Amino acid sequence: DDLMGYLRQTMEIRALENNISTLLGRAVLKGASHLYAGEEAVAVGAIGALQSDDLITSTHRGHGHAHAHGDQAAKTDEEKQIHFNKMMAEVLGKSGGYCKGKGGSMHIADVAHGNLGATGIVGGNIPVAVGAALAQKLMKTDKVVLCFFGDGASNTGNFHEALNMASLWKLPVIFVVENNMYAMSVPWAKSSALPNVADRACAYGMPGEVVDGM
């Protein structure tokens, strides 16, 4: 059942992104919207490994994270539909959205269920995740924070500072780098001396693994 559910979520994210792309082409959506097509399995698999009360932070390319997290938090088909409607309403800037339409495509959040939100600032969510993990440690919960970001964000100061603090303070945070091999138009090989982002983990005394996200 879990595997079928993950497949369904993956297909729903792709369908969602295809529809958003169509709406963008028709100028129905206002402002920028960064699609997650091709990376669906990362969000579904990573979030599927969480407990129901764990937390996530997302990126400007966050539709997939929002759907996977909200769908897995929903217990019934009716709740799943309500989640989908609220997420789509948010993308469209409608008052029925998770953030009453004020967040839009790049700032979807559902704090009540553990989605601490997306951000339009590349790498801006990484220190937020570390702060949330510090809060969990201080409150002595058993919650984990899952932090998504791209390869471009791993070249920002936020990344290095946040990883150093997370390791130093032994915080319950998992960093998931969704490396699509390009930051804007710059290929990874021309922006990093190391072949894999995960190779940087050892500098902060933490494990780093490369996982096939396809």
Give the residues covered by each predicted segment.
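N-terminal glycine-rich anion-binding loops that anchor highly charged ligand groups
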Residues: 8-24
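Cofactor-binding active-site loop characterized by glycine-rich and histidine/acidic residues
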Residues: 18-21, 28-169, 187-193, 198, ...
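Short loop or secondary-structure boundary microenvironments that flank
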Residues: 152, 212-213
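A positional/architectural concept
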Residues: 163, 173-175, 179
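A short acidic, helix-capping loop that chelates divalent metal ions and anchors anionic groups
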Residues: 183-185
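Structural signal for short hydrophobic segments within the conserved structured cores
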Residues: 207-211
